[in-house]
Amino acid sequence: MNIISWNVNGIRAVEKKGFLNWLSDCGADVVCIQETKANPAQLSENLISPPYGENASAALSDSSGGAGLFDDCKRYFSAFSSAKKAGYSGTAIYSKVRPDSVENLGDARFDDEGRVTIAKFGKIAVISAYFPNSQEAGARLDYKLEFNKAILKKCDELVSEGFNVVLGGDYNVAHTPIDLANPATNEKNPGYLPEEREWFTSFLNAGYVDTFRKFNSEPKQYTWWSYRFHAREKNIGWRIDYWCVHKKFEDKVVSSTIMADVTGSDHCPIQIQIEE
């Protein structure tokens, strides 16, 4: 199973930057999206049911948005978790095969912000997660740590039920100094606070694996860059997007990579391949 995760920083905005063409061509079986900043009622037909494969380009060039035309066009199934607050947060999962079931975290504190979408395919549970930003001066640090606790609990429950949990998304934390360009000057900044990093360590100690580091120990491997100061051009970034699995299923991971050449957001996609 080929799975991609991407914080698109607004799905309607990235649609205007070629997102649907990218999605059609990316070859993924499942695509996890974070920071949709929209609810399904605000989206085009092609964002609700994105075409792929033969006839996809024709459907995407159709001025009506693809509604009702090209019925033989293959389309992704979609599941959205939207925030109650308009234009904020939100997650989604696209899949070529309809999931057996779709659910949220089951905690209104976080479901009201659309933080998690879970899709089950047999005994694989794919999770698209948008971890909270702790914000300046740690204004939402307590909220984030409560979210972290809740998602770990959910993952543990799924693992205990025999699911291979594949947790992807924007974790909003750079775990170690190798995971950001300027660690020394960011020690008091959101995304690199000691409490956030300590939680990630405890998450790994609880039996989960940062799959990218399973294959790649090199520095300067980032997934997010500020829009300011030509940061991406200079590769002054942070690695805050991850694919994690439980160590029980670590041997199922074939590869875990960063798709740094894909643009359209301040994040780039990340990809994992797992044996089914």
Question: Locations of the language-model features?
Answer:
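Active-site beta-strand termini and strand-to-loop segments that position acidic
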Residues: 96, 119-122, 246-247, 272-276
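Metal-dependent phosphoesterases centered on the DNase I-like endonuclease/exonuclease/phosphatase
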Residues: 30, 51-52, 58, 68-69, ...
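Short, acidic/polar
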Residues: 12-24
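Active-site-proximal beta-strand elements of phosphoester/diester hydrolases
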Residues: 1-9, 123-135, 168
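Active-site beta-strand/loop signature of hydrolases that rely on acidic residues for catalysis
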Residues: 7, 23-41, 126, 155-177, ...
